[in-house]
Structure formats: C-alpha cells, structure tokens
Amino acid sequence: MTKTRTLVPLALAVAFATNASAACLSDAQAAELAAHYLSRQPAANPEGLSDADGACSRAKLNALLAPRLGKVVGYKAGLTNPAVQKRFNTDKPVWGKLYEGMIEQSGASVPAAFGARPLFEADMLVRVKDAAINQASTPYEVLQHIDQVIPFIELPDLVVQAPAQLNGPGVAAINVGARLGVAGQPIAVPATRGERYALLDALERMQVQLTNNQGQLLASGKGSDILGQPLNAVVWIAQAL
C-alpha cells in the first residue's frame, strides 16, 4: 500500500486587499482566470468578494486547474502575518491547494517569468505522516503527526492585473497565488520529547534570509512572523479544511 504524504507550506507573508460586495466568480469568469493562469498572463481582479465568495471561486478555479496540474500534494497557508493582514484589510489567513507539478527540488532552474505576477518568498514545508494531524491543536501535537520540516523557496504568482487591490477573499479566489516552489534538504522530526521542544523553539526563533548569487540580502524574516510560531499555521489549516 502506498502512503500519501501531504506537504503544508507556511507562508511568511503573501497578502493583498480592498472592499465592496459581489459574488462567487461565474463559471465564465473562473474559466477566464484559469486560462490567464495557464498562459501566465495577468487576469482581471476578482472584486469585492466575501469569504464565502472567495472559497467558492477557489473551488471553481481548482476544478479547472486540477486536470492540468496533477494530483493535490498539499495545502498552503497565506496571509499568516498579522501586520500583513491588517495592511490588506483582513484579519485571518487563507488557504490554497498545492499540486504535484508545483514542487521543484533544490538545484532546479526556474525562468524569471514563471508567472503573470511572479514573486519569491523564504518559506517552509512540513510533511504530514498521518491523518491525526487533523486533531492537532498545538504546535507540539503537530510535531507528533509530521515527519519532516523542509526549507522552501516559494515562487507565488498573484496572476491579476492589480495585485495591490486584492483583499483576503480575493487572495483565496486565486488559490493564494500557488504556482511553484523549490524544496530544500528535509529536516527529520526528532523522536524524543526534549528534542521536539528544542525544535519548536528553533522554528519560532529562526532567522530566515534570502540572498542572490552575489550574497546580497533580498528578504528576511523570522519564524515567529508566522502566527507567532510556524506550526500554528498547520493547526490553522487543519481546522480550516
């Protein structure tokens, strides 16, 4: 029997915003968004969506993308930084699906124009080992149900014409900008209680830097930027799904 492993990326900050009221994207609008995503061309902004509208629109988009992108291998959390949430007029994270074709391995080369509105972020993945993750309510409980923490350079794509005008539900509607990412060397979750608490502390206190090939600092962040502790994002995803 083959065991399915789920990857969960915990974005340091993918965020955006606006206001208004509209409805779930129509089938035609979702098809247009999917076509622009696949052709890497900016699409019209989904405007004025409620949380329910964003979730409905995300479902329509993913139904169209799945036949092209392969099986779902995990979920991503975005808008996980409270300061970013406030800046973009929302108070909660959002989630999207990751497909098998989105995950590259360390050393991969990716075109600079990999998306319509390409970005890069220092990030991390966790690999889920069993379904009991869905009952985890603390970071320590999360560690009991994952077997790897994986450094990850996420390469999201905001895909719309005016990314700064997206709100939280709008980010959900575009599947939280999921496009590509490069996974690094996995770190095994230790077996003993003491080592696991040490790992939790290290994840919260870690300093992450993204540099170019000349050593210039492009971006930086710390573990606590993700909901206070990175594995809180896993708890949130489990509850949101």
Predicted regions and their residues:
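Bacterial N-terminal signal peptides that target proteins for export
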Residues: 1-8
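Bacterial N-terminal signal peptides
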Residues: 8-19
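A conserved acidic, glycine/proline-rich C-terminal tail/linker
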Residues: 233-241
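Catalytic-core "active-site belt" of small-molecule-metabolizing enzymes
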Residues: 23-229
